[in-house]
Amino acid sequence: MTIKDNSQLFPLAKQQVNMRSVLAVMNAAEQLRDASSELIPSLLRECKKIDWIYNPLEYAWAPHAEWIRRFSGNGATTLLVGMNPGHGMGNTGVPFGCPEQVRDLLEITNLEVHQPNPLHPKRPVLGLKCPKPEISGRRIWSSLAQRYGSAHLISQTIYIVNHCPLWMFNQSGKNITPDKLTGPATQCLGSICNDHLLAVVDAMSIKRVIGIGRYAQRQVDALFKNLELGWVPHPSPASPFANRNGGADWRRAFEMVLEH
């Protein structure tokens, strides 16, 4: 079969739908990137708990865009929603992007990750070659790989985003989560994050949205009234449940949510 005969394997209409999905998700991410970066000075002024803000959509845009290009147009109808970046996405630009799994499972490699400016001395960014794993991301991606197989097969069912794109710390480098923020700029941030989530759901024709952790669950429950919704406890190593029985209890809970 020649290249011109590809339409017999992949109907043109389906190709166009997938490409429209990718372009719409990319556009939504670009808007979120730019709008959230514009809010950073106001957030730093108004929120006394935060002293440092990174936006991985800015400095790690290349791998994030690759994530969108390769995995947002493959037919997934279930969306997993996290809270905001941690060490994984903070280094790789991929939601829950444990560096080893971004490299080995997603095969996103050899893309430039810039340095945030200013850089917190206790929060270095090493990019895709970062040797330190993110336990939350490792738990999620290893469970998905065990259930579905390759990254492409995962993306035919599952896509992942974070509600908030910003990685925030206090002066000592302690992680500050979005639920700790207050002030008008925080309300603006929540609004643009909601707009992004709505755009992704619309672009991908998502049927089911699963919040990862209580914060994400609350955002999902408030936004979507006509979709199937779910929730799974956050896999953070700071969670006693996620650590129980070596993580087996969390994996079982995740499996049950995916099977529902």
Question: Where does each model-flagged region fall?
Answer:
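Short loop/helix-cap segments at secondary-structure boundaries that form the rim of catalytic
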Residues: 220-226
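Short, flexible loop segments at boundaries between secondary-structure elements
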Residues: 226-260
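Active-site metal-binding loops of divalent metal-dependent hydrolases
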Residues: 84, 214, 235
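A polyanion-binding, active-site-adjacent surface
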Residues: 4-208, 217, 240, 252-260
